Amino acid sequence: MSKPQAPRRVGEKEALAVATTVRGSSYKLNLVAGLIRGKKAGEALNILSFSKKAMAKDVRKVLASAIANAENNHNLDVDALIVKEASVGKSIVMKRFATRARGRSTQIIKPFSRIRVVVREQEEAE
């Protein structure tokens, strides 16, 4: 007896990819994610490949994973995919301490973020 299949978290013609612990602030990641929202998937990959932002590499990996999920798991046409959603949120925070003068210490915050990319197959306009 197999496990019951989990319900889909996205629509019928959509595919999803998530990265839960990406090292970097959500503000910087959101600047990069804003570049690809609403774009065609191939165009978005090109934008991220040639971006000078350091966070573009992480967003590109998640987008490539979403495209691969669409092709392999949901049998969607890769050439007709558009980026429906590219959202960024906060994840865990790693806290470290640095020593300071006079025997004191200060806290260093190292933020992590999560990226969620949804691609959708665009219907051809007739």
Swiss-Prot record:
Single GO MF descriptor: rRNA binding
Key words of the record: Ribonucleoprotein, Ribosomal protein, RNA-binding, rRNA-binding
Any one cellular-component term (Gene Ontology): cytosolic large ribosomal subunit
GO biological process, one term: translation
Superkingdom: Bacteria
Family note: Belongs to the universal ribosomal protein uL22 family.
PANTHER family hit by this protein: CHLOROPLAST 50S RIBOSOMAL PROTEIN L22-RELATED, LARGE RIBOSOMAL SUBUNIT PROTEIN UL22M
Assembly with partners or alone: Part of the 50S ribosomal subunit.
Function: This protein binds specifically to 23S rRNA; its binding is stimulated by other ribosomal proteins, e.g. L4, L17, and L20. It is important during the early stages of 50S assembly. It makes multiple contacts with different domains of the 23S rRNA in the assembled 50S subunit and ribosome. The globular domain of the protein is located near the polypeptide exit tunnel on the outside of the subunit, while an extended beta-hairpin is found that lines the wall of the exit tunnel in the center of the 70S ribosome.
NCBIfam families: rplV_bact
Protein name, per record: Large ribosomal subunit protein uL22
Species this chain originates from: Zymomonas mobilis subsp. mobilis (strain ATCC 31821 / ZM4 / CP4)
Record gene name: rplV
